[in-house]
């Protein structure tokens, strides 16, 4: 159904509990992030329903998330492309928000959009093409950008980033606190979980600062808030649940499933979370209280053909 020689869109209208995975079909021998953009659709029982081959993309489709209107968003940050898919399963026309490497988004109840700029500086990832800013030898500024529901730019938040080993990552993951007063975010494989006050437009104290050097794998990766304000935080082969002060409430060890949990999202039932492991290519459905793995999906794309870069659930 979903091979590079048979690119037929079979995505179905969204149903409550459907799971969506960003999993580009990699097919370039030189560029290890390049291929045919693809979003896989599964039902709530984790049975495959369909596939959407994304238009206008050339590299990894990452950062899947839903807005309050049930539209699915995704990103090809390599080419400054923002993807939107309507609840009927049809991709909406691509809107060019900005010449920026947006890789994630979060939303407020007023319909405003807050994009995380996934790239920073001018040190490119050596294995893949990354588009520069127009007229500049620069990948990005690593900021957060606010747009209104008419897609008009409103404000740029010049946020802090956390140094990381590769020197090109900016705001790679972001999540809106339930109060809608601030955004919590990370620089993937950096040492910090950071917060920015979007009401007062100011950097807040870091929520988490990890010890060690940039090569020791003691790193911050993905974050996502639970509705009650607890924070999910992935650490490679496990994830933590943090309180509002950044203290660890609980730890779920998933080491038997490998290192590389690059995305995490809470399930709508309040009892489970979904994790995306970019190295193994496997999505896990995990009980939040016990850590029991109750379901999984193997995308078939693992190291070196790693492309599993997003997981989202349609809540109806």
Segments from the language model and where they lie:
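An edge-strand/N-cap motif at the start of beta-rich repeat modules
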Residues: 1-50
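Beta-rich, blade/repeat-based domains predominating
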Residues: 5-15, 56-68, 98-110, 116-121, ...
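Short, conserved, GDST-rich strand-edge loop motifs in beta-rich repeat architectures
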Residues: 17, 21-34, 116-139
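Conserved beta-propeller blade signature
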Residues: 18-21, 72-74, 112-114, 182-185, ...
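Residue-level signature of beta-propeller blades and closely related beta-rich strand-turn architectures
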Residues: 25-26, 78, 119-120, 189, ...
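A short loop-to-beta-strand structural motif that recurs across blades of beta-propeller domains
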Residues: 36-40, 81-83, 142-145, 192-194, ...
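A short beta-strand motif characteristic of beta-propeller blades
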Residues: 47-55, 90-96, 153-165, 202-215, ...
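Blade-level signature of beta-propeller repeat domains, shared across WD40, Kelch, NHL, RCC1
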Residues: 278-316
